[in-house]
């Protein structure tokens, strides 16, 4: 039997998604909890491996098991065995052709900037603080040049292991909600640090350090050294993963929960 789960987590206490020896990972905690409920070893596969300090409200995983359990066991039952900063949001039995990573057609991220003179305490690990005023309209206008299929070498981590820097960005929007500036981006896939590198450069434009056309120039240069520094991990959330309609996976509010449910 193959089962898919929707997972939410605060990544600030973890060394990323991927299971590692001697350090705490989200995957490791989830597999341990699932194995207790299944009473057999469980290995999970995810839609996107997030880095240390990165969060998710819409991570999707799948696993295979030989045991029969009620849906409540895979949600509330597993949550009992998880730390408070990881939670299962939904469960769905899927057909054998489903794969959390390879069946996905797009991933969506939100980068949350707390744009205020003073840094936050309660959400210190849930947002990126930027104390200079940001012009979100300039940021949105500048970002539109990356739509479509492009070579993202300028926004790709040096250690990225992807075979190609080409990705297809389906939308990127920058909006303000009070003191929060939200960069919302969806693409077929992302190269390593792509969202955080884009966010770092957009903040340079938003505060007036760079012109609106700087993003287009960076894209054309294909040189990581020319772009801004990588933005912090704290503000980044994997909020949704798209799949073909045939799998009929549940929908959940993208969040994060401290933002309004009806964001654009």
Curated annotation (Swiss-Prot):
Keyword entries, A-Z: Isomerase, tRNA processing
Positions of substrate binding: 109
Organism taxonomic ancestry: Bacteria, Pseudomonadati, Pseudomonadota, Gammaproteobacteria, Enterobacterales
Enzyme active site: 51 (nucleophile)
Record organism: Photorhabdus laumondii subsp. laumondii (strain DSM 15139 / CIP 105565 / TT01) (Photorhabdus luminescens subsp. laumondii)
A single GO molecular function term of this UniProt record: tRNA pseudouridine(38-40) synthase activity
Name listed for the protein in its UniProt record: tRNA pseudouridine synthase A
Physiological role: Formation of pseudouridine at positions 38, 39 and 40 in the anticodon stem and loop of transfer RNAs.
A Pfam family of this chain: PseudoU_synth_1
Subunit structure: Homodimer.
Name of the gene: truA
UniProt entry tagged with the keyword Isomerase: yes
Presence of keyword Nucleotide-binding: no
